[in-house]
A protein has these predicted regions:
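Active-site glycine-rich loop that binds ribose-phosphate moieties when present
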Residues: 148-174, 183-186
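Bacterial N-terminal signal peptides
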Residues: 9-19
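Bacterial N-terminal signal peptides that target proteins for export
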Residues: 1-10
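C-terminal accessory domains and tails appended to enzymatic cores
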Residues: 82, 220-302
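Active-site rim beta-loop-alpha module in soluble metabolic enzymes
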Residues: 170-178, 182-227, 231-232
Length: 302
């Protein structure tokens, strides 16, 4: 077929303009990163995990570096927009001045969607950085679920879940898949057993609740960067973790008192001395209830 010169010129100009179009005019690739701290390389005790610990300030930097490595890997695979959730302790751990200016960060508590605040259906994939195993897992470093002091088990539709499972279910409500997790070997194995063949970046190997063999901070960042790039590249192969509804939430406390008092609520069923059951219409209603359970105190002040 012969193309008239004017039409040919118009076609060439159109293709040239398309090739140089700004990123905002092209398709976006949105990534959500939820960051915890117990699964950061080198973390083995409370000395690294909060302001009272003598190593905390250094390990805030290591946590920040691992999240930045995940961002770099995601961008190498084409990510154009990234939201980070600072989801450990007081939610004010990440050194935000070190982040690229186009990255946004969710900080502090409370939040209706807990460690996944800000997630919605516009995101393409989720990455977990610095995650740990569940409270029922005897293998993980600093293993717990939501509250190390108060909760003995959390179940969704009868399945005991780690925080990775809870947060994957929140993302799954919006049909967004989890594509990667970093942490110790127990956390990665537990998440992959629940969520399927997501990318796993193991940065330490657990010897017990307070001991591990660990990569150096630099080596852990290299591993996370590679895993994040692979995860975003494979995102189409990942399946969202979608729960059937209504969602049945079972929570077992270490003490009898919370279950006793919560059973006064008409929406709560006490299933044994230490356990309660709540049925939410979906995962969003369920996580909001769990956030209430783990955050409410009668003496709350601003």
């Amino acid at each position: 077929m012969r193309i008239a010169p004017r039409r040919l010129l118009a076609l060439v100009l159109f293709l040239a303009a398309s090739a140089t179009a700004p990123a905002s005019a092209q398709s976006k690739l949105k990534i959500y990163i939820s960051a915890d701290m117990e699964g950061i390389a080198g973390v083995v005790s409370g000395e690294q995990l909060g302001p009272s610990g003598f190593e905390y300030e250094r390990f805030r930097g290591f946590m920040t570096n691992e999240v930045l490595a995940a961002i770099e890997g995601a961008r190498a695979a084409g990510a154009t927009e990234i939201l980070v959730s600072d989801s450990h302790g007081n939610g004010q751990n990440l050194l935000i001045e070190r982040f690229p200016k186009d990255v946004q960060i969710v900080r502090s508590w409370p939040r209706p969607l807990a460690m996944m605040e800000g997630i919605d259906a516009s995101f393409d994939a989720v990455l977990f950085v610095g995650y740990h195993a569940s409270t029922v897992n005897p293998q993980g470093v600093r293993a717990h679920t939501m509250s190390s002091a108060n909760l003995a088990d959390v179940r969704l539709n009868g399945v005991s879940v780690p925080e990775a499972g809870l947060n994957a279910a929140i993302a799954g409500h919006y049909r967004v898949p989890v594509a990667m997790i970093s942490g110790d070997d127990a956390a990665v194995k537990e998440a992959q057993a629940l969520l399927g063949p997501i990318e796993g970046a193991i940065v330490k190997w657990s010897y017990g609740f307070h001991s591990a063999r660990t990569l150096t901070p630099e080596a852990s960042c290299d591993r996370i960067r590679e895993a994040a790039k692979a995860a975003v590249g494979r995102r189409a192969q990942m399946k969202p973790y979608v729960l059937t509804t209504p969602v049945t939430l079972d929570v077992r406390f270490k003490s009898y008192r919370p279950s006793e008092v919560l059973s006064y609520l008409p929406i709560v069923e006490r299933t044994d001395a230490h356990s309660i059951r709540f049925r939410g219409k979906d995962m969003i209603e369920t996580i909001r209830f769990l956030e209430f359970v783990t955050n409410y105190e009668p003496g709350l002040t601003p």
